[in-house]
Amino acid sequence: MALTPTFSRAPDIAPAPKGIIDPATGRPIGANDPTFLSISSELADRGFLVTSADELINWARTGSLMWMTFGLACCAVEMMQMSMPRYDCERFGFAPRGSPRQSDVMIVAGTLTNKMAPALRKVYDQMPEPRYVISMGSCANGGGYYHYSYSVVRGCDRVVPVDIYVPGCPPSAEALLYGVLLLQRKIRRTGTIER
């Protein structure tokens, strides 16, 4: 009795997942977001969506955030890593810009010195409203390792208002990406008038 080889029709390569799968739930990340759940249920029922202008503007704003780098130290390396293909922050609607007049978000990454503080404030003032600030890393959050130095500002929130703090020394690219997602959630919850 000879053994005959059997050929399976299953692919040799695992199929690529659609979106980033959350290991805890087995569903794509953001699938439990109440905003997207309500939109998909309304579209499934009627085929069109009824919303207010305020909600529409907030939805568009969260999907088209333009960020400006203010890399002052080693945290800037992780900030650059976030925009590379592995994490690809642009798929979340978060794209880099080179000019403060075209950007909505400033990421302060690194140690802010007393000499650099006026330049940071000047760049912040050039950004159009509504503008947001993400403080990235221990040095930007509170001075970090150089907290007791005479030339270091003990947190960039003493110079500009900060919306999201990302802790770490340096924080990973995943932590910064999570901070971006938190900022988008904060924008969705805040109206267009108040800020």
From Swiss-Prot:
UniProt keyword annotations, A-Z: 4Fe-4S, Cell inner membrane, Cell membrane, Iron, Iron-sulfur, Membrane, Metal-binding, NAD, Quinone, Translocase, Transport, Ubiquinone
Cofactor note: Binds 1 [4Fe-4S] cluster.
Domain of life: Bacteria
HAMAP family assigned: NDH1_NuoB
Functional note: NDH-1 shuttles electrons from NADH, via FMN and iron-sulfur (Fe-S) centers, to quinones in the respiratory chain. The immediate electron acceptor for the enzyme in this species is believed to be ubiquinone. Couples the redox reaction to proton translocation (for every two electrons transferred, four hydrogen ions are translocated across the cytoplasmic membrane), and thus conserves the redox energy in a proton gradient.
Subunit structure: NDH-1 is composed of 14 different subunits. Subunits NuoB, C, D, E, F, and G constitute the peripheral sector of the complex.
Organism of this sequence: Methylorubrum populi (strain ATCC BAA-705 / NCIMB 13946 / BJ001) (Methylobacterium populi)
NCBIfam families, A to Z: nuoB_fam, PRK06411.1
Name by which UniProt lists this protein: NADH-quinone oxidoreductase subunit B
Tagged with keyword Transferase: no
Short name of any one Pfam family annotated for the protein: Oxidored_q6
Membrane topology, as annotated: Peripheral membrane protein
An example Gene Ontology molecular-function term: NADH dehydrogenase (ubiquinone) activity
